Amino acid sequence: MFTGDRGLNALLESGVLQQEVPLANYTTWRVGGPAQWLAEPNNAEQCLELLQWAKAEGLTTRVIGAGSNLLIADAGLPGLTLCLRRLQGSQLDAESGQVKALAGEPLPTLARRAARLGLHGLEWAVGIPGTVGGAAAMNAGAQGGSTADCLTAVEVIDQSLTDTVKTTTLLSNTDLAYDYRHSLLQGSDQMVVAAQFQLEPGHDAKELMRKTSGNLSHRTTTQPYQWPSCGSVFRNPEPEKAGQLIEGLGLKGRRIGGAEVSSVHANFIVNVGDATADDIRALIDLVQNEVERMNGITLHPEVKRLGFQTTD
């Protein structure tokens, strides 16, 4: 348990908790100001301790994973930023197809492990630079597959109850009300610490590895992997494709400061070396306004904004 100054000092000395840490190193866009407090817990118990401490101190808590779907303001974030990328590890049963992974486990790592064991269902995830926790919260997906297709449950901590509840809770797939790039976890007090999946066992491992390699090759040749980005910026407004709408307006290569609409894939905004969060935000707004004006279609961002006066 977290006990006053002694517990705080222990977390500071161990490096789990730090002050005034630039968050640009914690996002795939490589932008973002400092966190007032940044914590990288190693397990669920430390998560609980940190949440209890933040609540006692009256600090706002925000949870991030790999930072692959975030735009953090240049001014940074007040309160406690809880980064779960150290919560890594997974258990895969080749016979039953049951999989459990901690929230910070990288999706590509889990996808490759599953393929090597002949477990089918996560091949689409090999090129997504996110974590299991983030994928569970936003229903990450690609190439016709999505997290909701194979996730059976998530283990969560209710941030609003950390002063009375000292354990985690299990929520089923149905509880999460999955939709396209959405779940009830978004905007809630539920913090994912682990997820459970049901994959299909008994598939040919070599064939699955070939498929994952092919999926990764396709993504690296059709998307701008050489520049920092958040992945796809906008949801596809079915039946249209966001990238095609943006490209159709001649917006590829449009630039504000160090932020640029990728010339490789128009639904990517890349940091070409010196972008700020304000540059990226302004370019997102410009693209949205142009598509709305010319096509009458509203593009909704997949990316979550933190630290701005208004958020998505």
Swiss-Prot record:
Residues 30-202 form the FAD-binding PCMH-type domain. GO terms for molecular function: FAD binding; UDP-N-acetylmuramate dehydrogenase activity. It is found in: Cytoplasm. Pathway: Cell wall biogenesis; peptidoglycan biosynthesis. Its EC number is 1.3.1.98. The active site is at R181, S232, E302. One of its GO terms (cellular component) is cytosol. It is an enzyme of class 1 (oxidoreductase). It comes from the Bacteria. Keywords: Cell cycle, Cell division, Cell shape, Cell wall biogenesis/degradation, Cytoplasm, FAD, Flavoprotein, NADP, Oxidoreductase, Peptidoglycan synthesis. Its main location: cytoplasm. It catalyses: UDP-N-acetyl-alpha-D-muramate + NADP(+) = UDP-N-acetyl-3-O-(1-carboxyvinyl)-alpha-D-glucosamine + NADPH + H(+). Its cofactor is FAD. GO terms for biological process: cell division; cell wall organization; peptidoglycan biosynthetic process; regulation of cell shape. Belongs to the MurB family. Cell wall formation. This is UDP-N-acetylenolpyruvoylglucosamine reductase. The lineage of its organism: Bacteria, Bacillati, Cyanobacteriota, Cyanophyceae, Synechococcales.
